[in-house]
Amino acid sequence: MGVMAYPFLFCLLLVHFGLGAIGASREAPSRPDPPRERTLRAKQHAQQPARASASDPSAPWSRSTDGTILAQKLAEEVPMDVASYLYTGDSHKLKRANCSSRYELAGLPGKSPALASSHPSLHGALDTLTHATNFLNMMLQSNKSREQNLQDDLEWYQALVRSLLEGEPSISRAAITFSTESLSAPAPQVFLQATREESRILLQDLSSSAHHLANATLETEWFHGLRRKWRTHLHRRGSNQGPRGLGHSWRRRDGLSGDKSHVKWSPPYLECENGSYKPGWLVTLSAAFYGLQPNLVPEFRGVMKVDINLQKVDIDQCSSDGWFSGTHKCHLNNSECMPIKGLGFVLGAYQCICKAGFYHPRDFSFNNFQRRGPDHHFVESAKDVSEEVHVCLPCSEGCPYCADDSPCFVQEDKYLRLAIISFQALCMLLDFLSMLVVYRFRKAKSIRASGLILLETILFGSLLLYFPVVILYFEPSTFRCILLRWVRLLGFATVYGTVTLKLHRVLKVFLSRTAQRIPYMTGGRVMRMLAVILLVVFWFLVGWTSSVCQNLERHISLIGQGRTSDHLIFSMCLVERWDYMTAAAEFLFLLWGVYLCYAVRTVPSAFHEPRYMAVAVHNELIISAIFHTIRFVLASRLQSDWMLMLYFAHTHLTVTVTIGLLLIPKFSHSSNNPRDDIATEAYEDELDMGRSGSYLNSSINSAWSEHSLDPEDIRDELKKLYAQLEIYKRKKMITNNPHLQKKRCSKKGLGRSIMRRITEIPETVSRQCSKEDKDGGEHGSAKGSSAGRKNPQETAGGSGKPKEESLRSRVFSLKKSHSTYEHVREQPGGPGSPPAQSREEEEATDNSVLGSPVGANRPRPLQEDSQAVSTESVPLVCKSASAHNLSSEKKPGPTRTSVLQKSLSVIASAKEKTLGLAGKTQAACVEERAKAQKALPRERETNRKYSNSDNAETQDSAPPNSSHSEEPRKPQKLGIMKQQRANPTTANSDLSPGATHMKDNFDIGEVCPWEIYDLAPGPGPLESKVQKHVSIAASEMERNPTFSLKEKSHPKPKAADLCQQSNPKSVDKAEVCPWESQGQSLFEEEKYLMSKTQVPLGRAQGENSGQHCATGVCAGQCEELPPKAVASKVENENLNQLGEQEKKTSSSERNVPDSHNSSNNFQPPLMSRAEVCPWEFETPDKPNAERSVAFPASSALSANKIAGPRNEEVRLARKV
């Protein structure tokens, strides 16, 4: 055939690869195995349960039983040199052993050798043998003539054997046997063999020596074993169809074929050559091929075998199949067997790797079982098999990997953590108790000033901010890490959101530059804004929690492990990018709070709460910045104890400090210093109660002082403010009093003129003080005379104020302006019952601040309280900026008659100029009166023009829903206004002791000079109205003394209210006006001068107004100092005419109720007015009338303003 036959045969084998794959068959029932094979199989089946139990990791300290059996067999049955060669692979030791036949490793532990086919290095040889066998089956079964001419086809068989070695390098030898008689012939007829010798292949024809195959030995087992059980390897598709079906299958080229399962594997063996073992372990693979009988029955024809060199095949003792499978010495419960690749056919090529949580005590580099070196003898290792057992010891608790038994996890300080959690629980309990205490003292002024709901909200948010420390006390888990973010963000948004919104409310109310009243921010509105903030935070937390749950489904955990510098491990909640975003959001929110703190830094407030909130916001900003920096930078290296202490320190440096700043000042505030209470109004309580109107002036003042606006802008703003306040008051009065007629537009001019004159008070006072040097002598005598007249009044009233204090309180005895909306604050009370506590406090404060003479007759405790909170001890804090810069405006505005309100700022702005000049002003007033005598005749005509408008103004300014007890007050006001027009001197008698809160230290001509212009003599019926009012008021005082005291505690709108003391049935005149008893001589002197001599009206008024204060009707209003001449004249005439004056006074007192009892209001009086009040017919000088422009109209306006809030009190008096 030649050389070309070998490649051709090899190609045929490759083409037949697919046919061999198709010929899969079921294995037929086998014949009984020979005794040797049965013994080997029995041993293998007996060892399988042992291996199964050894591989069970649940058995405690379980170890491979096959490893122990293998060691024992190698020590007992295997020759020493062979066992050493098997462990080391050293061929020098193998050459020293003598042999007579080959040595097989039969009966060794491990599963069936047939399963060794799974080894990757044997797949090539196995496939080549299977393809060659199937090729012979096809050739012999398809052509019967091939069996008859063996010698002719001998070259084809040689080419087939040679192709096996050339096709697979791992095959070292291949052979084929052929026999025409299946069982009758004891030996095969043809025996061909090919051997690989280094780089060449040797072909041999051993047919002549094939007779030795007839003997069944270990060396011929590959042939006899297949010959005996050839039927078990047969498989023919369609054999159940009979001969016809079988022939049909052959026509379709579907015949008998073999597969890999039909290949017979021999145990590994060593060949014996020349009395010694040849180095290299071999294994024999053999397969039979078949022909067909004439009846198409398969018949055995021969065997093909290949010998494979195993020196490059690794032994896997860790696997579950193959040679020496499961013979490792690793303990399966604490270690893992890992084979070592590339070492060849040697034992011990594996490592025992300790499992997680275990370590090897004698191995410091890595935890494994090292294979013994080539210089070590097997016997030495066999002797200490028990000592070589690989044992892994457990690590410390929680350690996944370790090299020794030292702890790898951070050991927590239990006592430290217990102390922290105990203190945290105490703080949370105190926080909860603080909520109860705040609710318990919810009616306290300090709590109402801040708002109960807002304080409770801050405390609840602080309780949430205390929870992170409690969460970090426990072992981290996914739920705890999620809950940690929830309580932190919700608590932060609740606490500092509320604080920031409170600051925002202060900024909105106090720093508004508009004159229009903005809608105040109540506690409910702040809570609604806070709800929006919490809703945003809640929505973010829901989204973040959803993303965390989705990451858990992707096996992305929220729990991680950190490692300290000492390589100790601890569990922690991982820091995500969302944590950086939340920290940035907190920082930006606090920056907004810092801006608000800066904006409201100058705003006055009750208990300085914005100042403490600003400290809390700045503290949170700084501490949180440090906390987040440490947390983000050192989070992976801070163990659980340090992280717990970090959160603990951050919580108490921010939350606890915030609570302390908000609560401690409220409960530790002392009420002994009322100066701060008066100077800094409790604005937040007013805002929450919806009564912010009285503090609008303060907000505008603060805004102007903050931004330093131009004076023109201030004037424009104030004009808008007063105009809108007037419109609102008019609308409210018309709404509540539909019976009142609307005012005419022609009356608006007078109101605007009066307002502009009011604003000129500071300049008037400053001009009066400029004449101090000129009138020095007169000032000293006037001051002494005024002090002499005031002492009896102070003695009768029980007042102990020094003379300096009374002089200082003259100018500033005006009552603080009442807001249009403060009538709501009046609380009703039944007849005869004491008023409410809040009403008493308000009355006490008003009377003490005003310093009226009526306050001198009050009980001692109320008087002391009044002195404590008097405005004499209050710093100059302007409650509004109503007229600070309007005084410089010289341009007269359009006239307008409207009921305006006076504010305390009118006097507060002038106090800086006049506080030290109170005594000096008196001398200037005396000089001005002398000059006013010349101007009166010329201005009487001017005063008559405004008489009608003043009448209408007085009627409209009366309280709308007055009861029966207030009906006398309307004609009283109307009559008094007409008296002012009838006689200029009547202006001094138009102020009651209640009205002295505004002008007890000022002369009418000095403060309100336009009132002098408006005064003109009126008809007689006007006097009857005054007398009627006096008699009714006196009867009311007689029937209800409580009502009389109540009337004294508030400013009366007109001076005629005290004329009721002239009634014989009323209280004695000395009790109401004690100074009258000591000043009768002065009164008699004036009366005598009127009746005996015809004194000009202007000069008489100048003298009387300088000599004494008005008695009965005008008590306490004129405390001006007279000139020296008038004073000396008074002293001389007091001694001579005292008796006659007392008689005339009593007669005049009896005539007053007679005129009151008149049925017609326009009936002429029974006595002339000169007999009752002779000093009113004295005419002041013209210069005095010109200079005194400010006060009577303003006092009338103040009376009109104050009359509104007293409807309820007058209604009660009517019931009495």
UniProtKB/Swiss-Prot annotation:
Glycosylation sites: 98, 143, 215, 274, 333
Pfam families hit by this protein: 7tm_3, GPR158_179_EC
Signal peptide limits: 1-23
Chain residue ranges for the region called Disordered: 25-65, 757-875, 911-1000, 1038-1072, 1128-1167
The keyword Signal belongs to this UniProt entry's keyword annotation: yes
Biased segments, Low complexity type: 46-64
Transmembrane segments annotated in the record for this chain: 418-439, 452-474, 479-501, 526-547, 577-597, 612-633, 643-664
Cross-link (Glycyl lysine isopeptide (Lys-Gly) (interchain with G-Cter in ubiquitin)) at residue(s): 774
Residues spanned by motif VCPWE motif 1: 1007-1011
Basic and acidic residues bias locations: 28-40, 769-781, 926-944, 1140-1153
GO MF annotations in UniProt: enzyme activator activity; G protein-coupled glycine receptor activity; transmembrane signaling receptor activity
Gene Ontology biological-process annotations: cognition; G protein-coupled receptor signaling pathway; protein localization to plasma membrane; regulation of G protein-coupled receptor signaling pathway; regulation of synapse organization
Region annotation Cache-like region: where it falls in the sequence: 85-281
Disulfide bonds: 99-272, 481-573
Protein residues bound to glycine: 172-173, 271, 307
Protein topology in the membrane: Multi-pass membrane protein
Residue ranges that the UniProt entry lists as topological domain Cytoplasmic: 440-451, 502-525, 598-611, 665-1216
Motif (VCPWE motif 3): 1172-1176
Extracellular side: 24-417, 475-478, 548-576, 634-642
Coiled coil: none
Post-translational modification Phosphoserine, affected residues: 694, 705, 708, 866, 947, 1066, 1081
Subcellular location(s) per record: Cell membrane; Postsynaptic cell membrane; Presynaptic cell membrane; Nucleus
Function: Metabotropic receptor for glycine that controls synapse formation and function in the brain. Acts as an atypical G-protein coupled receptor that recruits and regulates the RGS7-GNB5 complex instead of activating G proteins. In absence of glycine ligand, promotes the GTPase activator activity of RGS7, increasing the GTPase activity of G protein alpha subunits, thereby driving them into their inactive GDP-bound form.
UniProt note: domains: The Cache-like region shares similarity with the Cache domain, a well-known receptor for amino acids. It acts as a ligand-binding module that recognizes and binds glycine and taurine.
Family from the record: Belongs to the G-protein coupled receptor 3 family.
Identification of the protein by name: Metabotropic glycine receptor
Source species: Bos taurus (Bovine)
Organism ancestry: Eukaryota, Metazoa, Chordata, Craniata, Vertebrata
